[in-house]
Amino acid sequence: TAGAEVASRLAEAGIHVVVFEMNPRPYGKIEDGLPRWHEGLRAKEYETIREKLGHAGVDYVPNTKIGRDVSFQELANDWGFSAVILANGAWRDRPLPVEGADQYVGKGLIYQNPFIIWFNHCDEKNYAGERFVPEDGALVVGGGLASIDVAKVHMLETTRARLRARGIEQDMIELEVKGIPKSLEKHGLTWEELG
């Protein structure tokens, strides 16, 4: 979304813009960084990005990674661009600013991006990415909307796991929309009984 915003503003000012995107689609963190229950927000953001990149003065080039497919040197010196603007968004988690923390990645420390990507795809038959098993006693570090989403995913997934252990399959979207207490009530359960 960062690149689409910059491209749109420059194009509106009459500047021809080329947007290089390393992924097949231009949606960045909106595509896999939002938990799947944010369907309405995701659709709205997709449309906004399509509009911005659809401006007459914008050329969009997907599947092109700077440094792999084209060098920064080439862009800056050989392609005739008057400027190269790096608007690389939030596709990578910021590391936890605690010395030695990263040695625990894969041993209990889980960053938001891989966790939400797993959550968004874990019910797909062909999902081959990293897998997580949310358990009781987790700590979510952060104070923004992403940390709220992570805490919510954790709560929803631990609830679904406990229901599955009782032979009950529960649709995640329904669980999120109706809320855990009402969903449990539908199955004749309470928080206390679920454990």
Question: What name fits each language-model region?
Answer:
Residues 1-66, 74, 149-195:
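Beta1-alpha1 glycine-rich phosphate/pyrophosphate-binding loop at the start
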Residues 20, 87, 140-141:
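Short hydrophobic segments within beta-strands
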Residues 22-23, 89-90, 114:
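Short, ordered loop/turn segments at secondary-structure junctions
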Residues 29, 90, 145:
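Gly/Ser/Thr-rich helix-start
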Residues 45-47, 70-73, 122-128:
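A generic local structural motif
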Residues 48-99, 103-105:
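Feature captures the FAD/FMN-dependent oxidoreductase FAD-binding
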Residues 93-194:
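Glycine-rich dinucleotide-binding loop and its adjacent helix/turn
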